[in-house]
């Protein structure tokens, strides 16, 4: 299938700008932020196993569109004729797109995420996102949980008050699924998040124990100051922490356009490095962001 056919299949439209939520005159910075925001929702390393197959295809489509919209000639071809060049077979490889993604977006630390959460919660930006998610999900609270950053079940009374005020003022329509949510649905959601929280806590403790065992073993094998070794290892882990969302990129990342990847140079490098008997491709590992209650997966 062509890229535009895949756009229609997975996103319901052939309009690249509509899909990316961009104006036709959007610049590279806006394209980059839009790609980051959408790709985080379908990144293969950040979705449950049962969603990986479809999410991988969506991720590849979004990456292709990012490439088109940041390439002057390819974008002009699409703008003028509604055509996307699908000749490069190497673009179908997930590893190529994952490598590009890791080059485009700089790492963000857990401290950055925590600081941003403090600024975001109860801000005007949160209200804007809440309104958009309420309309997008037609009042479904499960949808809100998955689309409003940092929202958790403890926030439901506060969120309901904000939306009720919007309804009362006529800013948004009333959806019965929100104002009269069935108790069974609410109970199921709360049980789901309570279960996921416990599972995440167990996994976190397990990882901490394994890391401590490794640090102790390193000390026994190599000697040295344990505190300095742990600090160095922690800094290394933080430097590899995955990006959370486009607004975090905007706040803590480099705003300069110079960090935009040169796709043409990247493609030439890929083609030049190809050999008849190539070694098995090693997929670059991307650390998913898992900062306690920040992670959201399924409805």
UniProtKB/Swiss-Prot annotation:
Q: Which residues form the J domain?
A: 15-82
> InterPro entries from the entry?
DnaJ_domain, DnaJ_domain_CS, HTH_DNAJC9, J_dom_sf, J_domain-containing_protein
Gene3D superfamilies, alphabetized: DnaJ domain
Keyword Phosphoprotein: yes or no? Answer: yes
* Molecular-function GO term, any one: heat shock protein binding
Q: Does the keyword Nucleotidyltransferase apply?
A: no
- Alphabetical UniProt keywords: Phosphoprotein
* Phosphoserine: residues bearing it: 239
- Biased composition annotated in UniProt, kind: Basic residues: 268-277
Tell me the segments the record calls region Disordered: 266-299
Q: Which GO terms describe its cellular component?
A: cytoplasm; nucleus
Sorted alphabetically, which SMART domains does this protein's record hold? DnaJ
Q: What is this protein called?
A: J domain-containing protein CG6693
């Amino acid at each position: 299938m062509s890229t535009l056919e895949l756009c229609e299949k997975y996103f319901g439209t052939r309009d690249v700008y509509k899909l990316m939520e961009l104006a036709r005159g959007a610049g590279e910075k806006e394209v980059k932020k839009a790609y980051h925001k959408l790709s985080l929702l379908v990144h293969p390393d950040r979705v449950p196993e049962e969603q990986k197959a479809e999410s991988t295809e969506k991720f590849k489509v979004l990456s292709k569109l990012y490439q088109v919209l940041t390439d002057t000639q390819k974008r002009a071809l699409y703008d003028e004729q509604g055509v996307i060049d699908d000749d490069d077979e190497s673009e179908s490889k997930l590893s190529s797109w994952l490598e590009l993604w890791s080059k485009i977006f700089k790492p963000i630390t857990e401290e950055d995420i925590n600081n941003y959460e403090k600024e975001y919660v109860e801000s005007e930006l949160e209200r804007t996102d809440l309104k958009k998610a309420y309309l997008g999900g037609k009042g479904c609270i499960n949808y809100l949980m998955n689309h409003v950053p940092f929202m958790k079940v403890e926030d439901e009374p506060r969120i309901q008050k904000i939306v009720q005020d919007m309804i009362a003022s006529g800013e948004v329509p009333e959806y019965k699924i929100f104002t009269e949510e069935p108790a069974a649905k609410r109970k199921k959601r709360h049980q789901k998040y309570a279960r996921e929280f416990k599972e995440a806590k167990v996994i976190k403790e397990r990882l901490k124990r394994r890391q401590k065992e490794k640090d102790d073993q390193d000390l026994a094998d190599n000697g040295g100051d344990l505190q300095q070794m742990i600090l160095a290892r922690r800094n290394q882990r933080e430097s590899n922490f995955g990006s959370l969302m486009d607004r975090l990129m905007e706040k803590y990342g480099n705003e300069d356009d110079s960090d935009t990847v040169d796709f043409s140079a990247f493609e030439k490098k890929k083609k030049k490095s190809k050999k008849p008997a190539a070694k098995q491709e090693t997929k670059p590992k991307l650390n998913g962001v898992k900062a306690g209650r920040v992670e959201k997966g399924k409805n």
